[in-house]
Structures are given as structure tokens and as C-alpha cells.
Amino acid sequence: MYAVIVTGGKQYKVAEGEYLKIEKLEVATGESVTFDRVLLVANGDDVNIGAPVVAGATVKAEVISQGRHDKVRIIKFRRRKHHMKRMGHRQWFTEIKITGIQA
């Protein structure tokens, strides 16, 4: 059984027992989270597609950790001007474990 959920402006295909890094949620480590924006639920050949969401479907998850991704380095360069600007960015994430899918 798997589902497609929306969180942080992105869509994720999830299955029970899976670990996932999503955009940061303001939830403490160890607490549970419920996602109610479920776009699709599939159990074998039985596929339920929402319009836009599946009514009554939820995905439950447990927060494992909070952290930051590796640094992404950005360089802005102006040709022929001997000018270069170096920057970096580290995005926050929340790691979750999918504990249940209810359709």
C-alpha cells in the first residue's frame, strides 16, 4: 500500500515504514504528525485518486529528527569585470517515519 501526499509545496510517494526528509515542520522530535492532503491511495490494483484530495484519507508519521541539508554553494560571476560573489545555503529539513496509511 502506498500514497501520494503534499507537504511543503512538494509531492511525496510514501509507504508504511519508510523514512523521508521533508521541508521543516514546527513539531518536536518524537511527536506524531498527520497529513490530510492525500492525492492518491493505492492498495494493489485498487487505486483511489482524489479530485484534488482523497476524502477521509490520512497518513500518519512520527518525527525522527530535525536538521539541515548539506551546503549548496552559489557563485555569481560577472564576465570581464573581475567580480565574483560566493554564497552558500543550508536548507532545514524534518526527517519522518511513515507509521500508517488510512484510506
UniProtKB/Swiss-Prot annotation:
GO terms for biological process: translation. GO terms for cellular component: cytoplasm; ribonucleoprotein complex; ribosome. It comes from the Bacteria. One of its GO terms (molecular function) is rRNA binding. Keywords: Ribonucleoprotein, Ribosomal protein, RNA-binding, rRNA-binding. Pfam families: Ribosomal_L21p. SUPFAM superfamilies: L21p-like. Belongs to the bacterial ribosomal protein bL21 family. Part of the 50S ribosomal subunit. Contacts protein L20. This protein binds to 23S rRNA in the presence of protein L20. This is Large ribosomal subunit protein bL21. The gene is rplU.
